Every structure is written in structure tokens, then in C-alpha cells.
């Protein structure tokens, strides 16, 4: 399910890791229909294909991963089965894209955040409701939930019609240093997974939420391929590092969005 990684460019660079912008949750199970009311699905045209996931955090704003952006993205809210449309399913497109450019010292890996303003507000319904930004950080060792329409196998690009969910665990960021020698792994990123292997996010899970202790703590960012390898957790962007920036953008303070 959450095996989201953008492999193409990384394979060209002959790197052993990949962005999760096209992965599914491996080792997961179909999410409960009422478990993911905030989950957004990004589709692109030509050809019409599922791209990534995102999280509805406000009636008119979706938070995702910057590496997922494509021109002309269609954003679906309230979707569960891609083949069966709910009556309250809503389709939107972005009229504004915002990227974190506040700290030039940060690498692209540390600011893989994208905030999209929808063309019109989304109506709350049976299958749609926003997810709040975190009020406090989780502890290392916390159990977290990941979800997405990413690939379900670490060896075959098999995409599901329905989102899959899985439980993983926050581990010390040092666990991600060795598996990702080409990424500056810092405390600005969450390192999470199942060290025994078998459960992970993967291709096209990118941009989806990492929910720990009921709070939206991370955004699916990067991981090694094949996904779900033992002692190879994945990396997630820490939402708490960007809450002030997000709130300022939503409030219309685009010229003063960066924290002092």
C-alpha cells in the first residue's frame, strides 16, 4: 500500500533509493471506508493515471509532497474504490501551488512539501473531512498509520483500486542514515517502518499522511527500492516543521509566510 517512490529519475542516477511518489502500501490491508476521509488522490492526464496522494487539511487546501507536482493535476476527495464513485466524491484542481523556500540552507530532501489551494472549497460529507495539523510531536517508538493507493508488491507494479493501510513504527532517525547515504538524513525527517521488513510505503504512496497517535505527523517522502526491506525504514517529511508556514499561507500572508 504505502510503497511510494519516484523511481525513474533515481534509477537513471543509479541510486539505490527512490521517491515514494508512485508507490502503494506493501504489507497492508484495504483501509476501512471511513478511515481516510481526508485522503486526496492526485491524477494526471495523458494518459489518465494515478500519481500520488495528499491530505486535506482545510476546506480549500491540500498538503502533499513537492516531488509529486505535475501540471494539470486532478484532485479527488472522498474516493475509495477507483472503479466505483461515491455520491459525495468531489473533484478539484489547484489554482495555487506553494513550496517551502524559507531556508536556503535546507536541502530538497528536507523541504519536500507542497501546499495546494483548490479551485473551490470542499464540502464535508460522509466520506470527506479535513485532518488537523499536529498539536504536539510523537515519541520515538510510537505506532503510526500509513495509507495510499501505491503498489502492493516490492517486485511488481501492481496498483490497487482501493487504498491500503498499514501500521508502522517511528524509529530513531539514525536508523535511516546507513540505508540512504546520498540523502542528508536529519532530525527534520521522520524515519519510520518495520525493521523486520515486509511492511512499507512504496511507489505512488508519496504525499500521503503518516498518522501517529491520531495526529498528522508526516508526509510520505522517500524510500529504498525494492520497498519493505529489513532494516530499511522510509523517510517522511515532518509536518510540525512547517505548521507556521502552512497557517500563514492559508491566512493569505504569502509575503510574510516564512517564520522569523
UniProtKB/Swiss-Prot annotation:
Any single GO CC term annotated in Swiss-Prot or TrEMBL for this entry: secretory granule
Tissue: Expressed by the venom gland.
Subcellular location: Secreted
Enzymatic class: hydrolase
Entry-linked InterPro entries: Peptidase_S1_PA (IPR009003), Peptidase_S1_PA_chymotrypsin (IPR043504), Peptidase_S1A (IPR001314), Trypsin_dom (IPR001254)
Pfam families the record matches: Trypsin
Keyword Signal among record annotations: yes
GO molecular function, one term: toxin activity
Active site: residue positions: 67 (charge relay system), 112 (charge relay system), 206 (charge relay system)
Enzyme Commission numbers on file: 3.4.21.-
Domain Peptidase S1: 25-251
Single biological process term from Gene Ontology: proteolysis
Superkingdom as given in the UniProt entry: Eukaryota
Keyword Metal-binding: no
Similarity field: Belongs to the peptidase S1 family. Snake venom subfamily.
Subunit structure: Monomer.
Protein's name in the database: Snake venom serine protease Dav-X
